């Protein structure tokens, strides 16, 4: 995968050279390029200007972005504009991006964008219902979430498939050694060696955690018959506990 990032602050992306993203680069699975679009600004290196019609703040000018995009060699890239008004970023979107060969992220850093910039993009994405100073942190988050899904990036291909949200549910609780730590013991079922019992326990815990913490995820979740039976049992037990 090839990723190009348009930003005023390339140095902010130093953490991407480490951890999973750094390993992907070392394996030759990822190529990242940073483009400071101030270098392409014609007007005394100014990348922002006042909005026509008046208003608060400054807007990112179209010219530096267009010229930077012209300098990037790409065939059919997915061009992502980071914007609080964009569609929310989800795990399913990261899975979609992981299938692409070329991605371009445009990071703003002012009150907004000249609307003409949006003629360059394919996706307008938001990290959530809040506003950041710039798009860099959002881009780094999305890149990390995407790159780890590229085949052969993680040590075990199945390791990301049981992450929270990958299945549509939150992940079940997990434990490691020691068995007993300060009186807190690992659930006996995980020590039993009975794979079917462990599978059912994990399914129940995952459904229960999702129901208690993110019930909105269950509104569109496609339950199997087995999951539906377990989920009904969970709701019944929780209801009895409240009475």
UniProtKB/Swiss-Prot annotation:
Kindly list the places in or outside the cell where this protein is found, as annotated in its UniProt entry: Cytoplasm
Q: Which GO terms describe its cellular component?
A: cytosol
Q: What is this protein called?
A: tRNA (guanine-N(1)-)-methyltransferase
**Any one GO BP annotation for this protein:** tRNA N1-guanine methylation
Q: Does the keyword Repeat apply?
A: no
In the record, what lineage is assigned to the organism producing the protein? Bacteria, Bacillati, Bacillota, Bacilli, Lactobacillales
The family note in this entry says:
Belongs to the RNA methyltransferase TrmD family.
Catalytic activity line of the entry: guanosine(37) in tRNA + S-adenosyl-L-methionine = N(1)-methylguanosine(37) in tRNA + S-adenosyl-L-homocysteine + H(+)
Species of origin: Streptococcus equi subsp. zooepidemicus (strain MGCS10565)
Gene encoding this polypeptide?
A: trmD
Q: Which NCBIfam families match?
A: PRK00026.1 (NF000648), trmD (TIGR00088)
